[in-house]
């Protein structure tokens, strides 16, 4: 390998993103309140479709308890659940009969109140266009129990879904971040060597440290989840996603001139 090839091998060729507090900013939320809003929307939809629903409070709390129990188990097993599948199983046991599209809409109604809280960098589309203009591959690697259909509908509403050729959600796997296996699969799917991949996330423990260990170039996105914490050595920190094009150009220019 000649010198030019070595320097090119240090350049960024792909960027992987986390979702929550990275591409989509939710901030601090009130989970039970948001859950009740989702329960009300889904309950009303069931009633409008003539499905068996019973008392609202029972409907709300029985679903909440079931989800919290599964979430507790997932924290032990380190495997995220697919909340949509769980809600469908609960509904089917109660006699609800929907086709696939109705179940997807049902799941979206549970997620919709949370989606309305999300904001994005005002320049996010411009930023992603710039990154694609640099010839970079873009992807998503996120820990989540929200079904892909709901997440991707949400991203589509913000006009950013189609920028990402690779989309990986932890509930689709038997492990989640910070497990190295999910990062290795991301390397395979994005089709670039680890040292040529930048990973952008908000969690030091689940995003930045494992990204460093596998050889990525990690970037910590400022968020309430890392407020007051020290950025690990070897990582960069940004306040806004819109800072990425300039940072990547700087890193790649240094690599090319080395």
Predicted regions and their residues:
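N-terminal helical cap/lid subdomain that shapes the substrate entry/recognition surface
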Residues: 10-134
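Asp-based, Mg2+/Mn2+-dependent phosphohydrolase catalytic module
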Residues: 2-15, 48-54, 125, 129-132, ...
């Amino acid at each position: 390998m000649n010198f030019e090839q070595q320097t090119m091998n240090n350049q960024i060729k792909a960027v992987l993103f986390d979702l929550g507090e990275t591409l989509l900013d939710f901030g601090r939320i009130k989970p039970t309140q948001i859950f009740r809003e989702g329960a009300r929307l889904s309950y009303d939809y069931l009633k409008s479709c003539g499905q068996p629903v019973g008392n609202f409070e029972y409907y709300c709390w029985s679903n909440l308890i079931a989800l919290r129990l599964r979430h507790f188990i997932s924290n032990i097993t380190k495997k995220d659940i697919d909340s949509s599948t769980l809600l469908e199983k609960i509904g089917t046991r109660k006699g609800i009969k929907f086709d696939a599209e109705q179940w997807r809409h049902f799941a979206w109604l549970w997620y919709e109140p949370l989606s309305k809280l999300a904001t994005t960098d005002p320049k996010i589309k411009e930023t992603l266009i710039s990154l694609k203009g640099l010839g970079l591959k873009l992807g998503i690697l996120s820990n989540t129990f929200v079904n892909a259909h709901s997440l991707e509908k949400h991203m589509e509403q913000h006009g950013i879904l189609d920028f990402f050729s690779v989309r990986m959600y932890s509930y689709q796997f038997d492990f989640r971040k910070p497990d190295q296996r999910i990062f290795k699969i991301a390397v395979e799917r994005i089709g670039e060597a680890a040292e040529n991949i930048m990973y952008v996330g908000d969690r030091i423990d689940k995003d930045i440290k494992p990204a460093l260990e596998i050889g990525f170039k990690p970037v910590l996105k400022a968020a309430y989840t890392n407020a007051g914490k020290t950025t690990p050595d070897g990582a960069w920190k940004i306040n806004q996603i819109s800072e990425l094009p300039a940072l990547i150009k700087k890193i790649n220019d240094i690599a090319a001139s080395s």
